[in-house]
């Protein structure tokens, strides 16, 4: 079974506005609830695709209850540790006129040492049935900076593949524990390597440094430029799909979901890349974070290109 861990859980409430102006009452033309938190997003996406998973992490309050109910409605098993405060509620604002989006968030979830101990204990039990682990997102207030590296190390000690997606110090510390796969974006590549990353060639050079240094596979996402995948000795460029994006929230997490399916089933990485980017394309077409129509994903499966890189 695929196991996902989201320490700083959240739910996204997305508003579509004709245009955005400060200082005025703005009326949305559409609103949608979606999942939030990278690993939980992946679990929600997997559930809609019919792939079972176990979602873990910390949760609290009414928003935490809503999040668990949303996951369970997709057939996802849940085992969240009840923490303090409230699971985050993110407000995502999508502006139809400018094609830009912004996210309003606040750190409302708090954990104590006993909560962390509970999560570690439950996680170790979950590893008994895990075929792949997805870890992702930020860390809540009170969580130790070493949490991700500890969880990664425990899974790797059992030869369970780990997909890891975070940012900042959490990403750097987790990377040192050598997960199997990470998915840095353009800014994260630059931060991790200290290199300027503007072009695909820049991204390839930075990703190659990380692959050599940490022995990790990478999918480097470069927005409208597409993505690069460095999976062992196989290096690919994935051109962007032709999609009229409604919202980008959750699309990257769909890539994690696709790769987890391939790793869990011991399929070739190419199968995971095709599924992941097809799911991502479908997510782009939907306002709610990490939501999609399976028929869109099936259609995009035939359109995903894996081009050898360097060409």
Question: Which stretches of residues belong to each language-model region?
Answer:
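Conserved N-terminal subdomain of the carbohydrate kinase-like
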Residues: 24, 48-130, 299-311
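Short beta-strand scaffold segments in enzyme catalytic cores
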Residues: 44, 91-93, 226-230
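Gly/Ala-rich phosphate-binding loop of Rossmann-like dinucleotide-binding domains
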Residues: 47, 156, 264
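Conserved phosphate/ATP/ADP-binding segment of small-molecule kinases
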Residues: 145-234
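Conserved phosphate-binding/catalytic region of the ribokinase-like
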Residues: 172, 200-311
């Amino acid at each position: 079974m695929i196991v996902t861990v989201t320490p700083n859980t959240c739910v996204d409430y997305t508003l579509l506005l004709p245009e955005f102006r400060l200082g005025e009452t703005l009326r949305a033309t559409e609103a949608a609830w979606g999942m939030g938190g990278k690993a939980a997003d992946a679990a929600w996406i997997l559930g809609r695709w019919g792939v079972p998973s176990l979602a873990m992490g910390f949760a609290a309050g009414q928003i935490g209850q809503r999040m668990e109910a949303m996951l369970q409605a997709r057939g996802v098993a849940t085992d969240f540790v009840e923490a303090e405060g409230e699971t985050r509620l993110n407000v995502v604002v999508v502006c139809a006129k400018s094609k830009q989006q912004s996210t309003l968030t606040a750190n409302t979830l708090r954990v104590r040492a006993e909560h962390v101990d509970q999560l570690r204990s439950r996680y170790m039990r979950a590893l008994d049935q895990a075929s792949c682990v997805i870890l992702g997102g930020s860390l809540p207030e009170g969580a130790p900076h070493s949490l991700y590296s500890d969880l990664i190390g425990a899974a790797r000690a059992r030869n369970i593949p780990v997909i890891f997606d975070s940012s900042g110090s959490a990403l750097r510390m987790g990377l040192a524990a050598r997960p199997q796969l990470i998915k840095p974006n353009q800014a994260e590549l630059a931060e991790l390597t200290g290199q300027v990353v503007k072009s695909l060639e820049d991204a390839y050079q930075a990703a190659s440094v990380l692959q050599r240094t940490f022995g990790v596979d990478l999918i480097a996402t470069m927005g409208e430029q597409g993505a690069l995948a460095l999976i062992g000795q196989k290096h690919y460029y994935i051109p962007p799909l032709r999609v009229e994006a409604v919202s980008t929230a959750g699309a990257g997490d769909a890539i994690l979901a696709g790769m987890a399916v391939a790793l869990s089933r011991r399929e070739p990485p190419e199968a995971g890349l095709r599924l992941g980017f097809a799911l991502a394309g479908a997510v782009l077409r939907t306002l709610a974070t990490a939501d999609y129509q399976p028929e869109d994903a099936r259609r995009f499966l035939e359109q995903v290109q894996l081009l050898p890189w360097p060409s």
